Amino acid sequence: MPRIGIIGGSGVYGVFEPKETVKVHTPYGRPSAPVEIGEIEGVEVAFIPRHGKHHEFPPHEVPYRANIWALKELGVERVIGITAVGSLREEYKPGDIVITDQFIDFTKKRDYTFYNGPRVAHVSMADPFCPEMRKIFYETAKELGFPVHEKGTYVCIEGPRFSTRAESFMFRQFAHIIGMTLVPEVNLARELGMCYVNIATVTDYDVWADKPVDAQEVLKVMAENNYKVQELLKKGIPKIPEERHCGCADVLKTMFV
């Protein structure tokens, strides 16, 4: 059984060779796509393309609960979430990697929990991301010579539209990067006692910067980011220990009413 799961985009296929496809039926419907099982550097992993095999799910329609539940059903204990983000700060440049340490939720109508009754849970999200995996991927990015930020606050918006300029100026007062897919993925993983790390890749500056978007430049940055993520996964995943020493699963002891 795979103990590591990856949720991301098509760039993962550059480093991941699927060996088996598993259709998982969950109480929350079907995942974005059948789960693909394969190996990265000899480590068995499970992969779900977040937006579907053909990018058919916009951010607000991704079946987040089904995705996380499916990975848990297959034995996954650690989830690596890969996201593309815009920058809210000058120093977070296109092409940079951010190992997110906090998030702010500005989504509006997603399925946020597995516990809608009769059982009720209040999960602690003070430190939402696995410290063990954050350290591994930050240090690996440094070793590879990639521009990386050890911390960053991710503001997650509903989408699929982008922010207005007024919203962007507001968000940059308290966050570093902006995207549409981190929530509720991260809190659902926490509710099931799973470790979660977010590897965010900066594609461009958000609208606050008032810089014209050059489509060719964005595509170039995205291709470079895919390469960096692939190298990070190749070098970082083998460093993840078999046993968890992070305490991420401890929340299960205190979250139920």
From Swiss-Prot:
Keywords, A to Z, come to:
Glycosyltransferase, Purine salvage, Transferase
Q: Which Cys pairs does UniProt list as disulfide-bonded?
A: none
Matching InterPro entries = MTAP, Nucleoside_phosphorylase_d, Nucleoside_phosphorylase_sf, Purine_phosphorylase-2_CS
Specify the superkingdom.
Answer: Archaea
Q: Which GO terms describe its biological process?
A: L-methionine salvage from methylthioadenosine; purine ribonucleoside salvage
EC class, as a word, reads: transferase
Lipid metabolism is among the record's keywords: no
Q: Which GO terms describe its cellular component?
A: cytosol
Site location (Important for substrate specificity): S163, A215
- Alphabetical list of Gene3D superfamilies matching this protein: Nucleoside phosphorylase domain
The molecular function GO annotations come to: S-methyl-5-thioadenosine phosphorylase activity
A Pfam match: PNP_UDP_1
According to its UniProt record, the EC number is: 2.4.2.28
Q: What happens when the gene is disrupted?
A: Disruption of the gene results in a large decrease in ribose 1,5-bisphosphate generation from adenosine.
This protein's pathway: Amino-acid biosynthesis; L-methionine biosynthesis via salvage pathway; S-methyl-5-thio-alpha-D-ribose 1-phosphate from S-methyl-5'-thioadenosine (phosphorylase route): step 1/1
| Family membership | Belongs to the PNP/MTAP phosphorylase family. MTAP subfamily.
Primary role: Catalyzes the reversible phosphorylation of S-methyl-5'-thioadenosine (MTA) to adenine and 5-methylthioribose-1-phosphate. Involved in the breakdown of MTA, a major by-product of polyamine biosynthesis. Responsible for the first step in the methionine salvage pathway after MTA has been generated from S-adenosylmethionine. Has broad substrate specificity with 6-aminopurine nucleosides as preferred substrates. Can also use adenosine as substrate to form ribose 1-phosphate.
Subunit structure, per the record? Homohexamer. Dimer of a homotrimer.
Q: What is this protein called?
A: S-methyl-5'-thioadenosine phosphorylase
Give the taxonomic lineage as stored in the record.
Archaea, Methanobacteriati, Methanobacteriota, Thermococci, Thermococcales
Q: Which gene encodes it?
A: mtnP
